[in-house]
Every structure is written in structure tokens, then in C-alpha cells.
């Protein structure tokens, strides 16, 4: 993802990226940290390798944050196909955008000057009750949208108590539609038809 020609990984001190199996670029598990600060970058590097830089040079506490050879091989196998994957995912996003009833739901608006990676297609429904109706109708057809952003993080134990009414409202009403390379037009038509009919 870029904004005004600049990678989003260039904003802030440290950016993170997941390589989980559900992500655009995947290794099965793992992820990456991006940092433009040399000292901080060295500190993170040592932390991911038990605090070591080689067998005898110890810098402090650390974890085993390395991905396995198998996971690295998976990433290398996916990498040459990223252009095709992005093109296919864009066509899925375009189909959803052209065929969903936006009088009864909304989706994200991509800012001008943004190059997007088509990682998710979230829809925002009027209420959690309507979301559950749509989700149940899709599930009955063996289609499984996900609630990736539920529950609102302020409701989980270690941060419980913070008042975040907007987050709570949106988290309860966001549903992410199936989005992967290879979804057929027939499957997409089935998904959009079920959603639109559920909203009648």
C-alpha cells in the first residue's frame, strides 16, 4: 500500500506486517518489522534471535522470532505470483463494488493518491442484527465471511473499561467478505445476491 507515492511502511517509527495464511502475501505464519532507524533496527534484530548476534555476541533478552525454512520457502513460492494475485483480487473487489446494494450497506473508501493491496473487503451494516442475518444466510450457502475486527479491543480483559463507543459500534457491524484469487464470477454473483436479498 502506498499513499502519495510513499509506502505506508515509511510512516512512524516501526511498521508491522503479518504473513499469516489469510494475508495477501503469506508464509503460513510469521511477519515482518520495517524500521528506518538503524539503532532500533539492530535492537529488533537481536531481539528476534534470542538476543544474540552470532554464537558468542549477546545483546540482551530476546525470543525465537525467526520463520522456519518451510515458511520461507512458501513465501518465495508465492512471491512470483503477486502481480497475478493482486490483479485477481482487484477484479473481486470491483465485482463487489459494482453489484452490492450500497443503499443498505457501506464499505471502505480508498483515499485519492492511494495504491491499495485489496487485502480485505469489509462491509458495514446498519446493525449487528442485520449483520447476523446476512452472515447466517451466507453460512447456509456454505459461504463463510469473517468478523476480523470483532470484538472491539477495548472490551477484552487487559484493556477493559476504556470507553470507545465508535469502535464498539463499528466492530459489531463489520463483516469481511470472501476475497481471494480465483473466486469465480458465478461464486461472486451468489455472494452478492444473497447479501442483497438478505437486506430486502
Spans of features found by a protein language model:
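Adenylate-forming
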Residues: 27-30, 75
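Ser/Thr-centric signal marking residues that sit
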Residues: 22, 35, 184
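Conserved active-site segment immediately N-terminal to the catalytic lysine
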Residues: 1-26, 54-59
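Short glycine-enriched loop/turn motifs at secondary-structure junctions
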Residues: 24-28, 115-117
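Short beta-strand-to-turn element immediately C-terminal to the catalytic PLP-Schiff-base lysine
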Residues: 17-18, 31-37
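Short, glycine/charged-enriched secondary-structure capping and boundary segments
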Residues: 4-8, 30-32, 161, 191-192
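PLP-dependent aminotransferase class I/II
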Residues: 38-200
